[in-house]
Amino acid sequence: MAEEQKIALESESPAKVTTPAPADTPAPAPAEIPAPAPAPTPADVTKDVAEEKIQNPPPEQIFDDSKALTVVEKPVEEPAPAKPASASLDRDVKLADLSKEKRLSFVRAWEESEKSKAENKAEKKIADVHAWENSKKAAVEAQLKKIEEQLEKKKAEYAERMKNKVAAIHKEAEERRAMIEAKRGEDVLKAEETAAKYRATGIVPKATCGCF
């Protein structure tokens, strides 16, 4: 930046810039030195200089801007070749696909984990229900068996009671039959005795029923 400002200032004021001699220009050959002339007097020198100035005015100094400055241009560095847009786009697409695949992989893993948890939870609950069912069935069957045992015991007791009742009824019936038989025997014996008495006395007994 400082070199550019210096070049600009030198180009704006060419009168102050001296033209450098080319580096490769060969030096001129030395001219032959003439024999020294007699030294002029100071008055002659002053007069000659004044006349020379009048006859030959100093020419206007013309400067060639093209030769005034020698600008050394730095080689322009070529920019690195940019990657094609398609390659960058493909890279972005691949990165997006990888990110999406990774996200989907995490989602699938989470889904499988949640499904596994749900399956295990359901299986555990089903196992608990099965165990509860078996426990309740076992309790009911034990209660039923106990009731059956109680019923069997009561049935035996009732059967024994019934047998005892039947035996008592049979005994009472036998007693009643025996009493009837005894009464019948007494009545028959009494009738035979009364009939023998009537035969002996010749008395006719009164009819006791209306069948005669």
UniProtKB/Swiss-Prot annotation:
The keyword Cell wall biogenesis/degradation does not apply. The modification Phosphoserine is found at S13. GO terms for cellular component: cytosol; plant-type vacuole; plasma membrane; plasmodesma. It is found in: Cell membrane. Residues 1-88 are annotated as: Disordered. Its main location: membrane. GO terms for biological process: defense response to virus; membrane raft localization; response to salicylic acid. InterPro entries: Remorin_C, Remorin_N. It comes from the Eukaryota. Signal peptide: none annotated. Residues 45-54 have a biased composition (Basic and acidic residues). The keyword Cell membrane applies. Keywords: Cell membrane, Membrane, Phosphoprotein. Residues 23-41 have a biased composition (Pro residues). Belongs to the remorin family. PANTHER family: OS02G0117200 PROTEIN (PTHR31775), REMORIN-LIKE (PTHR31775:SF31). This is Uncharacterized protein At3g61260. It comes from Arabidopsis thaliana (Mouse-ear cress).
